[in-house]
């Protein structure tokens, strides 16, 4: 809709302009301060220029134009809103979607938690954010690919095997064992030990030579748990890349780096000269004993990603990884790629409360709040909504009990209630959407037109949210639209009114926007409550 409007304005004005959205919709749906930028050039006051420009729109079929204090205000006509509404309702699930784009293909890597335990609260924000970003991008017509990088080649995998062995001997065999300072603990480790006992027998827990075999067995079980947990909140990741499998590319990748002349040897170790591109220190890629560092694994993986030739790459990380960005981007540059094609999105911390107090740690995980525990308590919908309700650059704190309330203080309840309410109204009227598709919206009053306008701007909201990476704009939009609908419905009679069918059509558009936006954040709209 916005593109149609901009095209119409440009056709009449014949020059570029900025289109704004006034906060007060009673004044206008859109406005431009063009007259202010023309004042110096034309040597006239903005008020005089705006008055002259407004006259050029007298015959527009799209909007009524007025000049107010130097601004050009555009109020959309009912006929145009009716046409857009009818198209939206006919498109159904495809409403607010874009045509397949030839550029802008995007590779999104997110979560990438170590395969050593179930997903916990620290992973949830990035998981929900990444999946929502992918859903919106796909809906807008971008080619999107999502991937989870499995960190299965480091010391943490050896430690997983050791932890399983010790848990078996301690819990299953009741032996006195000495645990290291760092190890994985929790009921899930004991569960894995039980499964290993069934498959391999008791001997594997005492044979150090088989620790890696035990670790791989545990890793596979943990990955199954992770995939199940993700499926429980509607997240399906397309690719799963193994760090261990990619290590066969270590030598070719090192050779590729060397061609940049930004690698050197020092005391037997191999460094990249990342300080030349703004890093605090040069970084070791291969240790003096020949073992690759964690950075080496990331370099190999990003070389693999860039070889797949997407236009844009996004990594979604925890905020504590901020210091890692410069070294990785330097390495990508040394590999011969444009490091600006990689965008790092950082997730700030999450604090979880229950009845105003810190949420209790899970026995299953030993020392963490598990994602599955939260889903069990509040459901997938509430979890997904709350985790995109605030900018990723801000810390997030919420109370579980607040999300269980069935009133307007609980945003997901209030939004779903709006959608269910529309269905209830249609049922009471004994009509379907197809029955009111041809009802005219031209003669609706300003309040109704403003509600309709708010419902129809979803495409703009999605484009803005995706481009700015500020996904909270979608949840903010949902809250605003639901509130506007409830207010309008409470103030206006629908069933039995003279314009019943027109209002039902308006409500159908509202429900479509609510349903579409909810689906793009991974929530199925409720038809009844």
UniProtKB/Swiss-Prot annotation:
GO cellular component, one term: cytoplasm
Places the protein is found: Cytoplasm
PROSITE patterns reported in the protein's UniProt record: AA_TRNA_LIGASE_I
A single GO molecular function term of this UniProt record: arginine-tRNA ligase activity
Entry's EC annotation: 6.1.1.19
Family: Belongs to the class-I aminoacyl-tRNA synthetase family.
Record note on quaternary structure: Monomer.
Protein name (record): Arginine--tRNA ligase
């Amino acid at each position: 809709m916005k593109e149609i409007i901009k095209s119409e304005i440009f056709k009449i004005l014949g020059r570029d302009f900025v289109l704004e959205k006034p906060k007060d919709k009673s004044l206008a749906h859109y406005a431009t301060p063009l007259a202010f930028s023309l004042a110096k050039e034309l040597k006239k006051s903005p008020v005089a220029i705006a008055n002259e420009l407004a006259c050029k729109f007298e015959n527009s079929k799209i909007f009524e134009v007025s000049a107010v204090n130097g601004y050009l205000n555009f109020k959309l006509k009912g006929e145009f809103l009716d046409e857009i509404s009818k198209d939206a309702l006919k498109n159904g699930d495809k409403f607010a979607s874009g045509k397949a784009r030839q550029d802008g293909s995007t590779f999104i890597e997110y979560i990438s938690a170590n395969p050593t335990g179930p997903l916990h609260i620290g992973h949830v924000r990035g998981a929900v954010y990444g999946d929502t970003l992918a859903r919106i991008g796909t809906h807008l017509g971008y080619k999107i690919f999502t991937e989870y990088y499995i960190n299965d080649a480091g010391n943490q995998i050896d430690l997983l095997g050791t932890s399983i062995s010790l848990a078996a001997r301690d819990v299953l065999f009741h032996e006195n064992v000495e645990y290291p300072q760092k190890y994985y603990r929790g009921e899930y480790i004991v569960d894995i030990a039980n499964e290993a006992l069934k498959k391999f027998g008791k001997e594997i827990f005492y044979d150090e030579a088989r620790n890696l075999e035990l670790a791989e067995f545990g890793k596979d079980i943990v990955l199954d748990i992770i995939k199940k947990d993700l499926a429980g909140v509607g997240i399906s990741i397309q690719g799963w890349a193994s760090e261990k499998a990619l290590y066969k590319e270590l030598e070719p990748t090192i050779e590729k780096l060397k061609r940049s002349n930004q690698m050197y040897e020092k005391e037997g170790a191999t460094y990249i000269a990342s300080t030349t591109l703004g890093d605090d220190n040069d970084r070791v890629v291969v240790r003096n004993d020949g073992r690759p560092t964690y950075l080496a694994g990331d370099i190999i993986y990003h070389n693999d990603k860039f070889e797949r030739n997407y236009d844009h790459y996004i990594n979604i990380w925890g905020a504590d990884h901020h210091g890692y960005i410069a070294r990785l981007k330097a390495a990508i540059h040394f590999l011969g790629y444009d490091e600006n094609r990689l965008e790092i999105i950082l997730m700030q911390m999450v604090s979880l409360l229950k009845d105003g107090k810190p949420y209790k740690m899970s026995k299953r995980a030993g020392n963490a709040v598990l994602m599955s525990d939260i889903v069990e308590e509040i459901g997938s919908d509430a979890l997904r909504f709350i985790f995109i309700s605030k900018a990723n650059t801000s810390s997030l704190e919420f109370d579980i009990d607040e999300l269980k309330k069935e009133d307007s203080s609980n945003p997901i309840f209030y939004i779903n209630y709006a959608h269910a309410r529309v269905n209830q109204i249609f049922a009471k009227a004994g009509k379907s959407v197809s029955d009111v598709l041809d009802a005219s919206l031209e003669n609706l009053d300003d309040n109704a037109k403003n509600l309709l306008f708010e419902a129809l701007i979803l495409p703009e909201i999605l484009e803005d949210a995706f481009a700015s990476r500020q996904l909270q704009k979608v949840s903010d939009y949902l809250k605003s639209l639901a509130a506007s609908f409830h207010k309008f419905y409470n103030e206006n009679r629908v069933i039995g009114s003279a314009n019943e069918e027109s209002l039902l059509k308006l409500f159908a558009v509202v429900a479509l926007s609510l349903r579409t936006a909810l689906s793009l954040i991974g929530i199925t709209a409720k038809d009844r409550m």
